[in-house]
Structure formats: structure tokens, C-alpha cells
Amino acid sequence: AMPINNMLGYNFRLGEIECAIGMEQLKKLNGLVESRRALAERLAAGICELPGLSVPYVADGNTHVYYVFPLLVDPDVAGVSKFEIAEALKAEGVILATQYQNLHLLPMYQQKTAYGTSGFPWSAEFTRQDISYEKGICPVAEDMNDRTYLGFGMCTYDLTESDVDLIIRAFHKVWAHKVEMSR
């Protein structure tokens, strides 16, 4: 059987009906993004003082759409791992992603087997053959994936201010009880 998880650059083309729906949805985009920004700012303000937790930084003149609300945990300062934090927040009803896949570590790159069994683009004569995707070439991304990154999928939910306030309370509850988590 041909592997289905080793295709680079899927070509997803939309039909007319999907495009019509998309055109209508785009009319709502600015309002949805502004609402999500306001909620993200509320969330960031509510949890930014928790020791060992970093909220997204947006430099002046830049914007963020908060597809994901990324957090960084310093386990040494927090006193617990990101996995323990995620598990405790899950018990409070807040679901966080604990990993953001490092693409260079996917089997497709490790084995250089894209596009079925052809090995393209690595098998092509115009491709450098000495390209390595070994663990360690992206140390910051790998550390984030292994130890520090947590992500809240803000675009997954139709959140209200009161929902965000509940999430903030859940974070504070977890931080108040993190000593118990590390036992």
C-alpha cells in the first residue's frame, strides 16, 4: 500500500460552491479577527503574571490573529512541566496542545520519502544529496516542542468574555495548586 502521510504540498483546489461559501465567510473575517484579538488580549492580561508562563508578545506595528494562542512554560520557574500544567487545565475544562510538530522530524523528512516511493524531491539530480534533517538542527523549535510550548486553539471555539474569564480562573487555580501536581 502506498503511504498517505508523505506528500509535500497538497494541491487543494476549491470548487465553485466552496468558493461561494468562502467569499461570504471572508466578509466576516475582520469582525471575527477583531473579536478574537480582544479576547486574546483579555486572556493575556489575566495570566501574564503567572510565574514561568509567557504569553504572546506582539511588537508595535504588528498584529496577531490568534489562530493559536501560544504560551511558553519555563518548567524551572513554574516548578512543573508543561504536560502537568496541560493535564491540570484539562481537568478544569481547558484543552491545550502540548506539541507543535517539528516538521523536519516527520518520517517523510527523516526517510526522504515524499510522493509515494519515488523519494522526490531528494532523489532528483538537481537536489543536494547532503541535506540532513537530524534532530538537533532546530534546537529552539525542538525544545519548545519537548519542554516549553503550550497552545490554546482560540479559533476552535466561539468564546465570550465570560468564557475567557473562566479560562483565566482555571489557570490561576492550577498555578495555586501546582505544588500538589509535582508530588
Regions found by a protein language model. Give the residues of each.
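PLP-dependent aminotransferase class I/II
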Residues: 1-183
